[in-house]
Amino acid sequence: MTVNLLDFDGESLTAWFAEQGEKPFRAKQVLRWIHRSGVADFDAMTDIAKSLREKLKAKAVVAPPAVVSDKLSDDGTRKFLIDVGNGNAVETVFIPEDDRGTLCISTQAGCALDCAFCSTGKQGFNRNLSVAEIIGQLWQANHALGAVHGDERVISNVVLMGMGEPLANFENSVAALKLMLDDNAYGLSRRRITVSTSGLVPVMDRLGDECPVALAVSLHAPNDKLRDQLVPINQKYPLKELMAACQRYLEKAPRDFITFEYIMLDGINDTDAHARELLALVKSVHCKFNLIPFNPFPGSPFRRSPAERVRHFADILMQAGIVTTTRKTRGDDIDAACGQLAGQVQDKTKRTTGRVIPLKEARS
């Protein structure tokens, strides 16, 4: 059976090579060719013996998911639509800044968590992405951005904040994270990789044990009553449990703070009283807040909080000593802003709000 080498992290690739009677250093060579150099053709791996190249051609492929479209925003943001098969596509976003280049990666085709303010959840859920489909987004973005030639690192940061809940696809997300960290692959620092979660408490503990990277928690409400409505997973893992999990994660995290993501919804969660409730909620967790202006999508009942309200809300948090930033909306002209990623999902598990765009239309 032919295997896709993009599905292997360093450890599993070494094990597969051993099964083929090859030494560990050969696996490292191939890993460097695939991920550092972005090479998919075994014949182009010139420092590998011809006999091994022939063996690889017979037993393996390097098959990243295809890029269906590549849209460039007026602000330099790029959104890639990635074909993951069976009529499904996911979205990957590159956000350039003066001091960094951040790639936002998807981990699922759709999302089952159905957060009230997020268009991905309204598309429904199909399936988890494979390791190749997750790391393949980074592989393809490096090619599109010209980052596979020369020493300059175009993508300096990766965030698992695209479509889906990374911790609901734990095994494949962690394998992809390990490739990002591997010096023979992408060589990123743990501090420069962020996993975003809506609060799957037991799996947060697993991440801390197995692959601690920077953590962002989609908080969005200061109390259980409101969060139950906005982030339904809260009904299973309420805020008291979530805050305790954040404290445990900090014992293993590469950064000494948790980032709390907080979407600003006009008249819903943006009052002074909400800000004061937040201060009481997070008093035992060393944290930063990232306030996110709501990005509208068809069928949503919410409105973006006025800019002055967002500034005042941030001031309350900062006056209490909490570092608080307001995310600059990027890529909204190409629907690449936070909460707008919808891709194309053939939903088999629950109803879908709005129309799902077939890939044949997306390509046109």
UniProtKB/Swiss-Prot annotation:
Give the record's GO biological process terms.
rRNA base methylation; tRNA methylation
Gene3D superfamilies recorded for this chain? 1.10.150.530, Aldolase class I (3.20.20.70)
Compartments in which it is found: Cytoplasm
Instruction: List the cysteine pairs that form cystine.
Output: C104-C338
Co-factor: note: Binds 1 [4Fe-4S] cluster. The cluster is coordinated with 3 cysteines and an exchangeable S-adenosyl-L-methionine.
- InterPro entries given in the database record: Aldolase_TIM, Elp3/MiaA/NifB-like_rSAM, Methyltransferase_A, RlmN_N, RNA_MTrfase_RlmN, rRNA_lsu_MTrfase_RlmN/Cfr, rSAM
PROSITE patterns in alphabetical order: RADICAL_SAM
One Pfam family named in its UniProt record: Radical_SAM
Its main localization is cytoplasm
One GO cellular-component annotation of the UniProt record comes to:
cytoplasm
Ordered alphabetically, the record's keywords are:
4Fe-4S, Cytoplasm, Disulfide bond, Iron, Iron-sulfur, Metal-binding, Methyltransferase, rRNA processing, S-adenosyl-L-methionine, Transferase, tRNA processing
What residues bind [4Fe-4S] cluster, as annotated?
C111, C115, C118
User: Which domain of life, per UniProt?
Assistant: Bacteria
> Which E.C. number(s) belong to this protein?
2.1.1.192
Q: Which residues form the Radical SAM core domain?
A: 97-333
Single Gene Ontology MF annotation: metal ion binding
Something else the entry says is: Reaction proceeds by a ping-pong mechanism involving intermediate methylation of a conserved cysteine residue.
PANTHER family reported for this sequence: 23S RRNA METHYLTRANSFERASE (PTHR30544), RADICAL SAM CORE DOMAIN-CONTAINING PROTEIN (PTHR30544:SF5)
The family note in this entry says: Belongs to the radical SAM superfamily. RlmN family.
- Please report the name of this protein according to its UniProt entry: Dual-specificity RNA methyltransferase RlmN
The uppermost taxa in this organism's lineage are: Bacteria, Pseudomonadati, Pseudomonadota, Betaproteobacteria, Rhodocyclales
**Its encoding gene is what?**
rlmN
